[in-house]
């Protein structure tokens, strides 16, 4: 379910910025004209050029200022120079202005006033363009200004005079008709109002999607809670449990999933979970410490009516737990630690990364940042600058596209707790405004995110994405034992992250980029357990007792990473394949007389049905995405390998109802041939979805070839959570993830050119730490007992 969070209403959409400032754009244009090819660029200093090129640069800047195109014969090194047709890169997230235009265009296109009044806006996102459009933008209009991305002809590069207009994709729910529709809007003149004109958008298409329910919105959750709390039979049920103050009651609406025809998407439904706080004057009290059970409520969310209600069983409220709270001064008897000294991260010369709009350069990495209400953070166009080999692509698009949380208790209400937190709700639209010094440390660049609310207004989550560098311990080291001489390098990584809250749980999503060419995907899980109440003396084996009358059910968390790979592939090329590697033990015999032999065996995954695979730690199984036409210095194909971390498969039986919608959980790895529209493993609309195996499990039935293709990896990774007492009242972070690691991609370690640490002191000694500064032991009997 969605959570209430602070958002900032966007300023007037006509002035909302979309992309980099004019000065940055001018520096970029100058750099493009100066013919800086595929190398790393310094946008603060225009590279030196000869007189002819300087004149060309001046002409380009003048043209940019006047917005008139250059003459066709204006060129540098044979490349025609064109002005920007737009100030937003084709992959930049929609600006607040663009969202406003898209909403206004769709609303104006409603056939009748009733249709327009019933429109509710679930999602407004960028319709990502074809990869050829991205290649054009990256070649001549935006960083990295890599003209080699474009196909060549006998007459030179073909360069259109402008980029095509951006488009928005809207999911619209009509509250009056219970219909869901998808609209495509072309954003022609978004910022015209700033120049005294009008906003303009053009409807390209609109289609009603039958038999679906879109994600439930935060406004619907809030209205649902109010409806339930005002329902007289519900209030009577609360009084029977000794609850007279309804302000203490928390109603968390959950999507119903699909268990039977009663959950069909012909109705928009929610089944709430109910909790009760203890204190009316404590806004940060842990209200999840007292679940209210035995009450069954079914809400028609379309009409905001309770259509089924039953007080089935009187389960006593769990007692107030003195250890339930987690705010400062209220934990473990009200005593906080006093021996934590400040730790400062200082970068006196600033960060090593450079930014232009949503384009990032760091060390030898470059990529773009995107953001959607459903996925949250998206990483586009990942590439590595590899010396004389230039900018080498690795991936087109990386994101987390779904997560599923099934619970293992067969009793009501826990058996129906099977949340699809991305598809039923949205990871991005539940993202936090991050705080410096709390969520991220160091020199930080934040990115805001713009969303539509339920009624079509624009809201902005400030500081939604955090970009910063981190020290990550040792990168490599060797000491010559003969001479005693040593070389050591410290590892630094660039981290891009966001954090979201979905009801009681928090999820933090990270993409880490390393100096050795490695990419790590990480999820950190924290927040509060979803608890259940017990009868006096009751014990339930499907969870952990937190205190008498209160227990935490076992459950699993599954995440789906979608990775459209592009290892050494330019846009338009489909030269990747996937091999599975298993380490095998050699049979005893002539080849293994010492009985010590083992070797890595590779198997090419030739088609989609063959590429449904599971992790196997006993054979060190991993998978390599290789380019079929590029080799390293040994003649082997270049590649990147997916290295699994800790993982699991669903523990529910094969007939479990939630697996109807989550058939993709049956394997850890799926590989598909890229196809537009195949974006979410459970299909576009998993909420109340009655269709078995929609999405990934259906797409692979085509069994498309993978031997040389545009490859999409779907990696499903999960964790089985058997709760501990130490997970209460708020869970310490659990880590889960995987790594993309170069495998024959480079000719040697790309980390050998990292310079030595500037503060490396061969005469090591304590940092002025004396015996007197050691913290004295605390002899607090209360702390000792706790």
From Swiss-Prot:
How does the record describe the protein's post-translational processing?
Topaquinone (TPQ) is generated by copper-dependent autoxidation of a specific tyrosyl residue.
- Site Microbody targeting signal — annotated at 784-786
Cofactors: Cu cation; Zn(2+); L-topaquinone
Q: How is the cofactor bound?
A: Binds 1 copper ion per subunit. Can also use zinc ion as cofactor. Contains 1 topaquinone per subunit.
Reactions mediated catalytically:
a primary methyl amine + O2 + H2O = an aldehyde + H2O2 + NH4(+); N-methylputrescine + O2 + H2O = 4-methylaminobutanal + H2O2 + NH4(+)
Name the tissues where it is expressed. Mainly expressed in roots, and, to a lower extent, in leaves and stems.
Q: Where in the cell is it found?
A: Peroxisome
Which sites bind Cu cation?
A: 555, 557, 721
Catalytic site: 421, 505
Keywords on this record? Alkaloid metabolism, Copper, Disulfide bond, Manganese, Metal-binding, Oxidoreductase, Peroxisome, TPQ
Biological processes annotated in GO: alkaloid metabolic process; amine metabolic process; nicotine biosynthetic process; putrescine catabolic process
By its UniProt entry, which Gene3D superfamilies does this protein fall under?
Answer: 3.10.450.40, Copper amine oxidase, catalytic domain
Q: Which GO molecular function, any one, fits this protein according to its record?
A: primary methylamine oxidase activity
Q: Which Pfam families match?
A: Cu_amine_oxid (PF01179), Cu_amine_oxidN2 (PF02727), Cu_amine_oxidN3 (PF02728)
One Gene Ontology cellular component annotation held by this UniProt entry = peroxisome
Query: Does the record carry Disulfide bond as a key word?
Result: yes
List positions binding substrate. Answer: 419-430, 502-507
Q: How does it assemble?
A: Homodimer.
Q: What is this protein called?
A: Diamine oxidase [copper-containing] 1, peroxisomal
């Amino acid at each position: 379910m969605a959570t209430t969070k602070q958002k900032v209403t966007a300023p007037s959409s006509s002035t909302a910025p979309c992309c980099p400032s004019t000065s940055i754009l001018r520096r970029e244009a100058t750099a493009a004209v100066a013919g800086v090819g595929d190398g790393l660029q310094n946008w603060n200093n225009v590279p030196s050029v000869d007189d002819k090129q300087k004149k060309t640069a001046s002409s380009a800047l003048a043209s940019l200022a006047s917005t008139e195109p250059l003459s066709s014969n204006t060129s540098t090194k044979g490349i025609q120079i064109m002005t920007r047709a737009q100030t937003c890169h084709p992959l930049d997230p929609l600006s607040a202005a663009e969202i406003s235009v898209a909403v206004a265009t769709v609303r104006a296109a409603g056939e009748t006033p009733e249709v327009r009044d019933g429109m509710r806006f679930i999602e407004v996102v960028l319709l990502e363009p074809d990869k050829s459009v991205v290649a054009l933008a990256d070649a001549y209009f935006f960083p990295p200004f890599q003209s080699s991305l474009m196909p060549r002809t006998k007459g030179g590069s073909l360069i259109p005079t402008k980029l095509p207009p951006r488009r928005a994709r809207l999911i619209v729910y009509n509250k009056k008709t219970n219909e869901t529709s998808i609209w495509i809007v072309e954003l022609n003149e978004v910022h015209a109002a700033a120049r005294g004109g009008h906003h303009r958008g053009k409807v390209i298409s609109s289609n009603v999607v039958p038999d679906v329910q879109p994600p439930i919105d935060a406004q619907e959750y809030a209205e649902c809670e109010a409806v339930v709390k005002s329902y007289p039979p519900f209030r009577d049920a609360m009084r029977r449990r000794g609850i007279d103050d309804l302000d203490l009651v928390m109603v968390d609406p959950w999507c119903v999933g699909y268990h039977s025809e009663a959950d069909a998407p012909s109705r928009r439904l929610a089944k709430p979970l109910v909790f009760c706080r203890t204190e009316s004057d404590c806004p940060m009290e842990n209200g999840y410490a007292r679940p209210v059970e035995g009450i069954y409520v079914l809400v028609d969310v379309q009409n905001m009516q309770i259509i089924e209600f039953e007080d089935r069983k009187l389960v006593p409220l769990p007692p107030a737990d003195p250890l339930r709270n987690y705010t400062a001064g209220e934990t473990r008897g009200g005593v906080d630690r006093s021996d934590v000294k400040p730790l400062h991260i200082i970068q006196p010369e600033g960060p090593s990364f450079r930014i232009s709009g949503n384009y990032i350069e760091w060390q030898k990495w470059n990529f773009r940042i995107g953001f959607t209400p459903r996925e949250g953070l998206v990483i586009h166009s990942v590439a590595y600058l590899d010396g004389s080999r230039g900018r080498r692509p690795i991936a087109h698009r990386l994101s987390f596209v779904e997560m599923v949380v099934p619970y293992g208790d067969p009793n009501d209400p826990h058996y129906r707790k099977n949340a699809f937190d991305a598809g039923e709700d949205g990871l991005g639209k539940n993202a936090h405004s991050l705080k410096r010094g709390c969520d991220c440390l160091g020199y930080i660049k934040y990115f805001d995110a713009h969303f539509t609310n339920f009624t079509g207004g624009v809201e902005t989550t400030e500081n939604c994405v955090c970009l910063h560098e981190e020290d990550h311990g040792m990168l490599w080291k060797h000491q010559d034992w003969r001479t005693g001489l040593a070389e050591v390098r410290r590892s630094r990584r660039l981290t891009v992250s966001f954090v979201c809250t979905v009801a009681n749980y928090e999820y933090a999503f990270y993409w880490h980029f390393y100096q050795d060419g490695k990419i790590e995907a990480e999820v950190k899980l924290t927040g509060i357990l979803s608890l259940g109440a017990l009868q006096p003396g009751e014990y339930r084996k499907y969870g952990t007792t937190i205190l008498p009358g209160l227990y935490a059910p076992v459950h699993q968390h599954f995440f789906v990473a979608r990775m459209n790979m592009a290892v050494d592939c330019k846009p338009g090329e489909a030269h990747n394949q996937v091999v599975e590697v298993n380490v095998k033990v050699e049979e005893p015999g002539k080849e293994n007389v010492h009985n010590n032999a083992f070797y890595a065996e590779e198997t090419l995954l030739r088609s989609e049905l063959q590429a449904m695979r599971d992790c196997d730690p006993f054979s060190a199984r991993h998978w390599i995405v290789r380019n079929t036409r590029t080799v390293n210095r040994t003649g082997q194909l270049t590649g990147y390998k997916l290295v699994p971390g800790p993982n699991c498969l669903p523990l529910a039986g094969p007939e479990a109802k939630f697996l109807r919608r989550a058939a993709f959980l049956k394997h850890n790895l799926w590989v598909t041939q890229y196809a537009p529209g195949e974006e979410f493993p459970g299909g576009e609309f998993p909420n109340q979805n009655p269709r078995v195996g929609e999405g990934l499990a259906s797409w692979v039935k085509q069994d498309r070839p993978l031997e040389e293709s545009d490859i999409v990896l779907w990696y499903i990774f999960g964790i089985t959570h058997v709760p501990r007492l130490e997970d209460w009242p708020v869970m310490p972070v659990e880590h889960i993830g995987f790594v993309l690691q170069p495998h024959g991609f480079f000719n040697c370690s790309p980390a050998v050119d990292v310079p030595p640490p500037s503060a490396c002191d061969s005469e090591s000694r304590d940092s002025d730490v004396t015996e007197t500064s050691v913290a004295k032991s605390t002899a607090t009997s209360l702390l000792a007992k706790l």
